[in-house]
UniProtKB/Swiss-Prot annotation:
Assembly with partners or alone: Homodimer. Homotetramer. May form homodimers under conditions in which energy sources are sufficient (active state) and homotetramers under insufficient nutrient conditions (inactive state).
PANTHER family, A to Z: GLOBAL TRANSCRIPTIONAL REGULATOR CODY, GTP-SENSING TRANSCRIPTIONAL PLEIOTROPIC REPRESSOR CODY
Keyword NAD: no
Protein name stated in the entry: Global transcriptional regulator CodY
Compartments where located: Cytoplasm
Binding-site residues for L-isoleucine, renumbered to this chain: R61, T96, F98
UniProt keyword annotations, A-Z: Cytoplasm, DNA-binding, GTP-binding, Nucleotide-binding, Repressor, Transcription, Transcription regulation
GO cellular component: cytoplasm
Species per Swiss-Prot/TrEMBL record: Staphylococcus aureus (strain Mu3 / ATCC 700698)
HAMAP family: HTH_type_CodY
Encoding gene, per UniProt annotation: codY
UniProt family annotation: Belongs to the CodY family.
Length: 257
């Protein structure tokens, strides 16, 4: 397969995800397919965003890493010290992705590291490993292209996350501001009673303890549910199950006291 064909295959995958979050596992599998390598896509803090490995590489240590979806902190630090592409790293180098405890299996292995950059900052690392054969110039071109594309996707996801947080905060603020004094007091007591982000509420018990009517509690919950801040479900005589949908709600409620 030519370099152009390999690049097109990677582009085809990304076009499928246009407008939605990219599954980095799919990206890793595509990179693995077109480069015939083992692949790790790692965040700057060492989280494994995506990977594609052959069975030979799956030692006990690697399996544990995959289960935890995190690489060891010392290896993360070493990766972050790599400022530009480093190619054809052998098994005896501390940057090898292959398990040194199985050195005899990977004596001819080669690791290549591509820093993932975007928006002027380091976002992570693309690590490719081959059991045999050096990485050639075409491999390096494709790897650097893949790292650039991954960087753009990570940035897009970060921006989407920031936008979502801003929307959530606005919705939470509007919901809290829509509550009357007594409704807000009722909500504060409800979540003190729950002691967390979800649980079972018996409205009459809270109403009696706080000295407000049950209808105040019902109205307050309805306003929050309409704003998409919480969800509630009646369990009949057992009470009402309540769950917070927007994770910053309790923090904002505390700030508003």
């Amino acid at each position: 397969m030519s370099l152009l064909s390999k690049t097109r295959e990677l582009n085809t995958l990304l076009q499928k995800h246009k407008g939605i979050a990219v599954d980095f596992k799919d990206v890793a599998q595509t990179i693995s397919s077109v480069t015939v390598t083992n692949v790790f896509i790692v965040s700057r803090r060492g989280k494994i965003l995506g990977s594609s490995l052959n069975e030979l590489l799956k030692s006990q240590r690697i399996i544990q890493m995959l289960e935890e979806r995190h690489i060891p902190s010392e290896y993360t630090e070493r990766l972050m010290e790599v400022k530009q592409t480093e190619s054809n790293i052998d098994i005896d180098n501390v940057l090898t992705v292959f398990p040194p405890e199985n050195r005899e299996l990977f004596i001819d292995s080669r690791t290549t590291i591509f820093p993932i950059l975007g928006g002027g900052e380091r976002l992570g690392t693309l690590v490719l490993g081959r059991v045999h054969d050096d990485f050639n110039e075409n491999d390096l071109v494709l790897g650097e292209y893949a790292a650039t594309v991954i960087g753009m996707e990570i940035l897009r996801e970060k921006h989407s996350e920031v936008e979502k947080e801003a929307r959530d905060k606005a919705a939470i603020t509007m919901a809290i501001n829509s509550l009357s004094y007594s409704e807000k007091e009722a909500i504060e007591h409800i979540f003190e009673e729950l002691g967390g982000t979800e649980g079972l509420l018996i409205a009459s018990k809270v109403a009696d303890r706080v000295g407000i009517t049950r209808s105040v509690i019902v109205n307050a919950l309805r306003k929050l549910e309409s704003a998409g801040v919480i969800e509630s479900r009646s369990l009949g005589m057992k009470g009402t199950f309540i769950k917070v949908k927007k994770e910053k709600f309790l923090d904002e409620l505390e700030k508003s006291k």
